[in-house]
């Protein structure tokens, strides 16, 4: 009974979120996509709470990088679909996770790196489905996804639910990556990335997308538990510790987020 109540509550919250998205917020996305300008509404820092537009976002990401991130996401969706009926290689999970993590806000705004990652994703897809690239009658089942199809989706509910799925698995990929570098993985978590990415490309109604949104939350909890296990097993359980707050002359090395492995190496 408590589980059922929780699910109903979450569904109502998501429905309320979708119904209250400003019309200008959605209209601007279509306008700026058509004009090839910057538009991103991934994070809570978006300009005017309507999304970042123009030459660059609040985070510093420019239109070219935003477009490359969309292209990378579309390539990841193509790779995920290719793995639907074909076995992965030993590197596919890592490429999916690293690719999603790369598109998280403020992680990587380097155009050359993004371009190289797009190429790596496409090369991995060729290994998974080697015959598709030379097929004389392509079926499109493993084609890279054009993110404009999502941003220009006329149904606001469908567009919003798919966006929630995308942004959710991007954040989950960050947790998964940090656990992975410490040698910890979870097949349930890894498999869900493929499912969620594929669902973004499918022509589905809200009643089919909402359960996937809820599943994002469920799997993310498993991923957070995985990261906690990785960190505590490797470095021990955190305890309150006094640290000096003295300001000293630099230079400094700043370590942020969950990069505990990087700190250990330093």
Describe the role of every protein-language-model region:
Residues 35-265:
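Metallocofactor- and cofactor-centric catalytic cores in central/energy metabolism, strongly enriched
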Residues 13-33:
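Short, Lys/Arg-enriched N-terminal segments with co-localized hydrophobic residues
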Residues 8-10:
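Short hydrophobic alpha-helical segments enriched in small aliphatic residues
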């Amino acid at each position: 009974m408590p589980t059922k109540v929780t699910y109903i509550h979450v569904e109502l919250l998501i429905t309320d979120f979708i119904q209250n998205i400003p019309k200008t917020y959605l209209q601007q996305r279509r306008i700026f996509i058509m004009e090839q300008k910057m538009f991103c509404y991934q994070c809570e820092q978006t300009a005017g709470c309507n999304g970042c537009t123009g030459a660059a976002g609040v985070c510093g990401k420019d239109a070219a990088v935003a477009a490359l991130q969309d292209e990378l996401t579309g390539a990841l969706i193509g790779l995920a679909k290719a793995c639907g009926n074909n076995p992965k290689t030993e590197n596919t999970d890592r490429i999916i996770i690293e690719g999603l993590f790369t598109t998280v806000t403020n992680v990587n705004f380097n155009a050359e790196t993004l371009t190289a990652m797009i190429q790596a994703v496409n090369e991995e897809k060729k290994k998974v489905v080697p015959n598709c690239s030379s097929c004389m009658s392509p079926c499109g089942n493993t084609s890279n996804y054009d993110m404009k199809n999502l941003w220009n989706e006329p149904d606001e509910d469908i567009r919003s639910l798919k966006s929630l799925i995308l942004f959710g698995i991007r954040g989950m990929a960050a947790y998964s990556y940090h656990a992975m570098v410490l040698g910890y993985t979870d097949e349930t978590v890894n498999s869900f990335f493929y499912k969620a990415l594929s669902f973004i490309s499918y022509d589905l109604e809200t009643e089919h997308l909402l359960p996937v949104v809820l599943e994002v939350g469920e799997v993310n909890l498993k991923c957070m538990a995985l990261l906690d296990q990785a960190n505590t097993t490797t470095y021990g359980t955190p305890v309150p510790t006094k640290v000096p707050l003295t300001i000293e002359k630099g230079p400094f090395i700043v370590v942020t987020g969950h990069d505990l492995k990087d700190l250990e190496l330093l």
